[in-house]
Amino acid sequence: MHMADALISPAVGGAMWAVSGGLIAVCARKVKQTMRDNLVPMMGVLGAFIFAAQMINFSIPGTGSSGHLGGGLLLTVLLGPYAAFLVIASVLTVQAFFFADGGLLALGCNIFNLGFFPAFVAYPLVYRMVAGGRGGAFRNWAAALGAAVAGLLLGALGVVLETLASGISRTTPSAQI
């Protein structure tokens, strides 16, 4: 789900920009070190697909946020976590700048919530443990389902924690916001 700028304070937004920027730098370095011939074209094609799929938004009433299909886990399974994080960061940046999906202040939060949790938590701790390289259609299906649910729930938890850290809630009187 994309966070709107109204959900976070400038301090939290700035901190998450710094965290996400640091992750982008680390991922770019890792991708450069392990570059394969077909990686960049795959990143481009899959990025375009995820961009189109994520443009189908579902409004979340009363929050100013929207939810959509999450492409982070699919990218991670197909590209690996470092390349996937770079692609999802690129997709989210284009969506924020050109389509006002999310907000510029919240872009760091959105990159972290939609990129970090699927690529670096759900994929290694759920998908790889369940699928385990042993194959089998049911095992892969169960691993993908479990990791997708974990990634989405962790992303939603990230939104809650970032909003809480900002001191913005529905119970806050509007004069204080």
Question: Which role does the model predict for each range below?
Answer:
Residues H2-S9, V31, M35, L39, ...:
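Membrane-helix interfacial "entry" motifs
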Residues G14-A15, V40-V45, G70, F85-A89, ...:
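Hydrophobic alpha-helical transmembrane segments
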Residues A25-K32, A53, F58, Q95, ...:
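Membrane-water interface at transmembrane helix exits
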Residues Q54, F58-P118:
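Alpha-helical membrane segments and adjacent membrane-interface helices in multi-pass membrane proteins
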